[in-house]
């Protein structure tokens, strides 16, 4: 298959979406699929929208670009939209509506958590053709190598993520 991932991949630390795109591309290539980060090939089988906001530095293409591709290049290309963002995590009031509109250009939706899926469902997004795929961890980074048990006295380190409104 020829698959395009809508991310401008950055080298170095750039957030979970960037890591997701890198790891997905690696997995797909290891399984003999061709991966692109643009809409240049005229025979794409699948397009993954990861960031439809054209003002985002990580966006390789928008839902509007995908619409033009389907209208003028290849109409039977499947489109999947990965939703990893919401207003609730940053106390904004425009992201959800924008992503819900962008989602109308997709055939299928992948949410990064049940929480975010339910959030969009409650706001009116049709989640019939969707699933939740939780992020995996890079075992080269997240492992028990060098693990030191907590001594009960030192500060506890807590890691959190924006898959909830608990900020």
Placement of each model-derived feature along the sequence:
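Conserved donor-binding/catalytic core segment of Leloir-type glycosyltransferases
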Residues: 149-167
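A short beta-strand/loop micro-motif in the catalytic core of glycosyltransferases
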Residues: 47-48, 105-114, 131, 159-161, ...
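Extended catalytic core of nucleotide-activated donor transferases of GT-like folds
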Residues: 32, 36-105, 115
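Nucleotide donor/acceptor-binding cores
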Residues: 1, 77, 154-157
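Acidic anion/phosphate-binding donor-loop and adjacent secondary structure
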Residues: 91-93, 121, 136-155
